[in-house]
Amino acid sequence: EEVESFDLVILNAGVLGKIKDMQDCSIEELRETMEVNVWSNKWILDTCFSGGRNIKQVIGISSGASLSGSRGWNGYSLSKAALNMLIKLYSGECPSTHFTSFAPGLVDTAMQDYMTNLPEDPRYAPIEILKAAKGTEAMPSGYECAKKLIDAFPSLLENESGGYADIRKL
């Protein structure tokens, strides 16, 4: 049976890549990150909207890294900034759907395990902030974060479609 509409579509594709300077990243590494973090989400949206399906709300899981431009976050920051723009562009094309790029804050995931196990490097200062947050309320488990996100989703409808929100600022 064909689905005619969706109440909520959550786009949660994300790979980090290696923490290193942008000039040390190959185009291929950046392309792979963009493929997962941006283009897979475009494919999902196009598939969901195909056949004239209606969608009430789309939430693209973004990151504070999409705005910060912190050294070392290279393709991840670039791809999450591109995801923010993808969400904004779709919001202009699909005015009956509410779109939000939504940063979940720090979440204790395999990505955090990788970053918090990196050796100290003064070039990548934000890593030390993550290390300090690991194992505290500032970095909840995926399950705890999911509960907070689900509770926050309805309030995002009050914001302008196509915008960016960070759970830490709600």
Model-derived features: where do they sit?
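Rossmann-fold scaffold of SDR-type NAD(P)-dependent oxidoreductases
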Residues: 6-14, 37, 60, 100
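Alpha-helical segment proximal to the catalytic Tyr-Lys
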Residues: 50, 92-93
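Catalytic loop of short-chain dehydrogenase/reductase
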Residues: 57-92, 103-107, 113-116
